[in-house]
From Swiss-Prot:
Keywords: Cytoplasm, DNA damage, DNA excision, DNA repair, Excision nuclease, SOS response
Organism: Methanococcus maripaludis (strain DSM 14266 / JCM 13030 / NBRC 101832 / S2 / LL)
Domain of life, source organism: Archaea
Function in brief: The UvrABC repair system catalyzes the recognition and processing of DNA lesions. UvrC both incises the 5' and 3' sides of the lesion. The N-terminal half is responsible for the 3' incision and the C-terminal half is responsible for the 5' incision.
Gene name for this UniProt entry: uvrC
Record protein name field: UvrABC system protein C
SUPFAM superfamilies xref list: C-terminal UvrC-binding domain of UvrB, GIY-YIG endonuclease
Record bears the keyword Translocase: no
Length: 527
């Protein structure tokens, strides 16, 4: 179930998955909400896109700072997942880099091959964006692009787009200074370059060198138009993890951005109860199962890692991580630059993820007029094929997210043939009698997939167990929501946030039940 209202309007990448959780398509957008909405609101899709839309079961998104970052990240994700529909719809060849050669007077151009000597920046998934950046750099800094330097100036020199090192009109020192400026931009160090150029421009003006000051001003204007350069793809040789941490209501939320060879290629989310030594416990457990990077970027060191004289010093943790990696590992707390931008991006994604789920939970509390927030929600579904292999499922959502360790499947034992009412009665009774017997945590809200009949059956079982847990059901056809003792459905529109959240939970319970049903049928066939 795709809940459009949860999607931000930021630029970023969206990841579509099918019912089995396989990534089937990766896309990028300037406005995530607008782009994803177009898949489900537009009716006249081409056949391939229509087939894609029918296969979409769930979606993830990663927010970026701008559209160029989204372009680069899209390429990274496509290479990682090789999604079915991207392979069909996109050119699978490698994307090109902007290349600066290793010569006395380096040239600038485009290359897909990184084996030759030189410096490479990119890759660029958009040929239009790549060509624009290259064109600006060539014109702004008058860098040559010819493969072999001619003995006399070419047309680019005559239209003032090249300094013509071939003719000896510029010294090697001055030319390499222009190359250095271009490299500053391609590395993302735009602000520092603009600052240097402004100082240089002011100095020229003071010395009454107005023509040269004007040329520098033109350079600054061109550079500022390029200020949205990407910071997700960086031409570096090391790996790093970027870890953002958010504490909320006694819970710790952690998002890890994995950066491989300068490229953001994955993210992972974790949630657990707050403990005093959570950070080192998390790092030890996480890196016991994952590769240790050269750098771990974090917003701040926990207190017990800031001091060397406590029980658990930073030296011990770093020694453990370095030993596992086989080389030195460092914690970094960036205050500015690209790494700070990556950290800010990780924090932004984590806040959107956590707060988005909190908004869903609160909207449900308000619409159902519950006394407390439904932080733990369980949903039941029954699945069968013509009365055979009847199974039940219960899924649990905790703080707005699936909590799969608390999913349960039931073989129906007391019902013959098709009887959804009795089947619901059985699974509800079995589920909550066991929770009561083992003194385990009960949900704040129960959802039944079905109409008033299934709702009544579940309510009867809860009364037998003397449980007073808020209970609703959702009927498939019109997505109507019912509650015990009220004849008419609740006045909640099916496209409201609360209803969409209920539909999301119901769809997950349905998927889980169907998968179990298929498994049992397969076992029956091979007996």
């Amino acid at each position: 179930m795709i809940n459009i209202s949860d999607i931000p309007k930021n630029p970023g990448c969206y990841i579509y998955k099918n019912e089995s959780g396989t990534v089937i398509y990766v896309g990028k957008a300037k406005n995530l909400k607008k782009r994803v909405s177009s898949y489900f609101n537009k009716k006249n899709h081409d056949p391939k896109t229509e087939k894609l839309v029918k296969s979409i079961y769930e979606m993830e998104f990663i927010v970026t700072d701008n559209e160029v970052e989204a372009l680069i990240l899209e390429n990274t994700l496509i290479k990682k997942y090789s999604p079915k529909y991207n392979i069909d719809l996109k050119d699978s060849k490698n994307y090109a880099y902007i290349y600066i050669s290793e010569e006395n007077f380096p040239r600038i151009g485009i290359s897909r091959n990184k084996s030759k000597k030189g410096k490479f920046y990119g890759p660029f998934t958009s040929a239009k964006e790549r060509d624009y950046v290259l064109d600006v750099l060539k014109k702004t800094f008058k860098i040559r692009s010819c493969k072999n330097m001619h003995k006399r100036p070419c047309l680019r020199h005559h239209i003032k787009n090249c300094t013509a090192p071939c003719s000896g009109d510029i010294t090697s020192k001055d030319y390499l200074n222009q190359i250095k400026k271009a490299e500053h931009i391609l590395k993302g160090n735009i602000d520092s370059l603009i600052h240097e150029l402004k100082n240089e421009m002011n100095e020229k003006s003071k010395n009454l060198q107005f023509e040269e000051a004007l040329l520098i001003r033109e350079e600054i204007n061109a550079i500022e138009r390029l200020k949205t350069r990407q910071n997700v793809k960086r031409d570096v040789k090391y790996n790093e993890d970027v870890i953002s941490i958010l504490e909320k209501s006694g819970k710790l939320h952690i998002m890890v951005f994995n950066v491989l060879k300068g490229t953001l290629f994955d993210r992972k989310y974790f949630e657990f109860d707050y403990t005093e030594n959570f950070f080192e416990e998390f790092l030890i457990q996480y890196y016991s199962e994952n590769d240790v990077p050269s750098e771990i970027i974090i917003s701040e060191l926990p207190k017990n890692l800031e001091e060397d004289n406590n029980e658990y010093s930073s030296d011990a943790l770093l020694e453990y991580l370095s030993k596992k990696k086989g080389s030195k590992v460092a914690f970094k707390i960036p205050k500015q630059g690209e790494k700070k931008q990556l950290l800010d991006l990780a924090i932004k994604n984590l806040e959107i993820y956590v707060n988005g789920n909190e908004i869903k939970v609160q909207s449900l509390k308000n619409k159902l007029m519950l006394d407390k927030s439904p932080n733990i929600i369980e949903c039941f579904d029954i699945s069968h094929l013509s009365g055979t292999s009847t199974v039940g499922s219960v899924v649990q959502f905790r703080n707005g997210k699936p909590d799969k360790k608390n999913y349960r499947r039931f073989k129906i034992k007391t019902v013959s043939g098709i009887d959804d009412f009795k089947s619901i009665s059985e699974v509800v009774f079995r589920r909550y009698s066991k929770l009561l017997e083992e003194n385990l945590e009960l949900p704040d809200l129960i959802i039944i997939d079905g109409g008033k009949g299934q709702l009544s059956s579940a309510f009867s079982e809860l009364r037998k167990l003397k449980l007073k847990i808020p209970l609703i059901s959702i009927a498939k056809r019109e997505e109507e929501i019912y509650t015990p003792g009220i004849e008419n459905p609740l006045p909640i529109k099916k496209n409201e946030k609360a209803s969409l959240f209920i539909q999301e939970i119901r769809d997950e319970a349905h998927r889980f039940a169907i998968n179990y049903n298929r498994l049992l049928r397969k076992k029956e066939l091979i007996k």
